[in-house]
Amino acid sequence: MSKYRIELRPAAVKALRRIDPQDRSRVQGAIALLGEDPRPPGARALQGRDGYRVRVGNYRIIYTIRNDILVVVVVTVGHRRDVYG
C-alpha cells in the first residue's frame, strides 16, 4: 500500500497521452513508485520554483509533495528539452 497518494494534474495526463507507449509505461511506473518514496535517489529539487523532478530516460516528471496530507501532485511530464519551459 502506498504511503502517499498520487494526484495527476490535467496537464500531466495530457502529456502522458503524447508519449510513445514504451516510454509511457516506464514513466507511469516511476510515478507509481513516488507513492512509496516521494524523494527517491536521483530526485532533485527544482531551482526557482517549488517541486522536484525525477529522470526517466529522456523524460522528466515534475511534481510537488504535500507532506501535510501525504499527497504527491504530478504537475507535468515531458521530454527533457520541453518540460522546464
Feature annotation, model-predicted:
Residues 1-6, 10-25, 55-56, 64-85:
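Enriched for short, Lys/Arg-rich terminal
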Residues 29-54:
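A short, surface-exposed loop/turn module that caps and links secondary-structure elements
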